[in-house]
Amino acid sequence: EAAGITVLFRFISYSFAYFRIFGRRNRLKRMKKLLIPLIAAFAANTVSAAAPQQVIDISTDKVSMVLTAAPGGEVYFRHFGGRIDDPAPLADYKSNRRSDHGTEDLAYPATGGRNFREPALRVTHADGDMNTELRYVSHASKQLSDKNVTETVVKMTDCCQALDVELVFTAYARENVITTHAVIRNREKGPVTLHSFYSSSLPLKADKYLLTHLYGAWAREAQVDHTLLTHGSKSIESTREVRTTHTENPAFLLTLNSDSFSETCGEVIAGALAWSGNFRLNFEVDEFDVLTVLAGANPNASEYRLRPGETFTTPEMIYTHSFCGAGGASRNLHDWARNYGIYHGHEVVPTLLNSWEGAYFKFDAKVLKQMIDDAASMGLEMFVLDDGWFGNKYPRNNSNAGLGDWQVNAAKLPEGIDHIASYAHSKGLKFGIWIEPEMVNPKSELAEKHPDWIVRPPKREAPTTRNQWLLDLTNPKVQDFVFGVFDNTMKLSDKIDYIKWDANRNANNVGSAYLPADEQSRFWIDYAQGFYKVMERIRAKYPDVLIQACASGGGRVEYGAMKYFNEVWTSDNTEALSRARIQYGTSLFYPAVVMGSHVSATPNHQTGNITPIKFRFDMACAGRLGMELQPKQMTDEERQFARRAIASYKEYRDIVMQGDLYRIGTPYDKSGCYGLMYVSKDRKQAVLFTYSLRYQGRSLIPKFRLQGLDPKTGYTIRELNVDKSRNWFDGKTFSGEMLSNAGINPSMPKIYDSGVFLLTAE
């Protein structure tokens, strides 16, 4: 410490000697402005090097995240993984790296200093300075009113500029989840420009890193990819806005110290970003084999000007850790999602019949009433009227016209929506209706009246997707309009219980008539924030209405939207074979309670595939069960089967919605056999789903070792959705130990064979 102080005083002495030798008054003033911040920074570094490191412990029941910092020094990231009861020794941690190769692992690295990795924060300050070096100020932790939740705030400031950053960590003890975001505050005299503003930087050290993430397309969402990370960078990102999760999803699994994926064993970190706009997850492995994960809003074309006194809050990043493989990480996320991440995550959405694939745009009151009658006769609990019910000057008889004109179509429904909703209620069904309030057809009264509300750049054409344009949610007037669409739809009847909110295009060739010309790059952030402002207003007025997030299927499957929505429409592809992979991938990060899954007609309208009614039901029952077909086209045998399957589903629905998920194999396995089971929290009941996804012949006999059961408890197995079981174990009782270690071998010799088995503790 004494040596550091000696060096500091020598530096100050030499500086003032320089002033005496070279100092004209005006030059002296300029040099002081340059040197005094340098002296302050030097002093901070010298003092912090001598001061003891403080340990910042952010822990749950089984997981710890540990930072260290000294006053005026940098904030270091020391650990994320299994819980450490006493992390104090990490105050003395040394990385043994040469300083000229880069800094230690920083909690929130910025452009500046010795950080050579991609920064979490990149800023141009008001005076043009492009460097930022964050220094520790203080930290504090407090338990929230929910005693399960602890919040820790770490305050930092730039060593030379009036720019502050707060890192906010929220620990959920029982769920073993830690979330984090950053708050950036401008105290400078002029505006600063944020070029990169990630939510989180997570440095990790392991021998190997296996990245698991989701990719896909429309009607082929949530396909699973495994990549062994090597030196360099890999990014998962979306630049599409609105429908951000078709091609990539803002979530990942990292298996540490292994190049193989396992459901049951190994150290796994899971992350998911709660953001409905463009996102970016960057994975960078450096020369020390340190992996740094950056996660947050995508900085691409999104420079954000922060005026003096303004703050910018990044989206929330969600992390968990497990030593029990991918399955353990998924269950942690599912528990957190039901308790905190999904709007009313413990509320069950009713089984339903959706009109879309059964009627499309061609319906009237008679058609809808018949569908309602059929839904009631099969035991369904809700009827949802999809697209096509609105527009008069430009009637919504196809996708070319009417979108934006939210008046009830008098030709189709002369007695209005209340007439249909009341009829559904009279049959014992709830009623839901479809809207797409963020969009507009060129052929609409809204487009004629408010061309300035349409997202388009000046002097360029506004391209259409699905024959529609995007409304500019950066504009408060458009936010008012979108809220009004929801509000006025609810006023059509006091018997509307459910809203399906759709969004059928991305954003491209963007431009805003509302934003100033020099702030057009705010569009990508402000659109998502405008969407959230609308949803906040909706939930304040309609806290109990069920709302589904649909965006051409699974285009909004992420935790930013789920804060306001009860469920998502997992995919527009309702074909059961395709759904095996779609629902499997989705389940890695999102629980069954949020997954809409429908039984549709065969041949399927998306793929043309022909599958038996039992296979379609058994697949759909692994999520929130619904139907999407014309019931009058079903055979009597299919109707009878549907009644039985729906009744069975209600018997075990709570286990699927609220239980622990155990995946047994994957739909990618060469065997073509795949299973999953849900186990109640008290382990007294479980439901097992098994599927044959390709022809097995007589040579491949699958065995399923069950998971999550109490080894000392006996479980009686009952096969559902069959007249007579062909399985030798049906109706018999086995210990959880036997079922886990020896397993069972359901008979599934043919493609599209499937089984649903209810296990009950004796």
Regions found by a protein language model. Name each.
Residues 62, 182, 309, 424, ...:
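Conserved, mostly hydrophobic/aromatic
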Residues 414-416, 448-450, 454-612, 624, ...:
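Active-site neighborhood of glycoside hydrolase catalytic domains
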Residues 112-134, 265-277, 319-342, 380-387, ...:
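Glycine-rich, aromatic-flanked loop segments that form ligand/cofactor-binding clefts
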Residues 344-484, 493, 498:
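Aromatic-lined carbohydrate-binding/catalytic grooves of carbohydrate-active enzymes
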Residues 62, 252-253, 263, 667-711:
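Carbohydrate-binding surface patches
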Residues 129-134, 304-323, 752-759:
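Short Pro-Gly-centered flexible turn/kink motifs
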Residues 51-58, 63-66, 73-284, 300, ...:
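Polysaccharide-binding surfaces and accessory modules of carbohydrate-active proteins
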Residues 694-762:
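C-terminal beta-sandwich/jelly-roll accessory domains of carbohydrate-active enzymes
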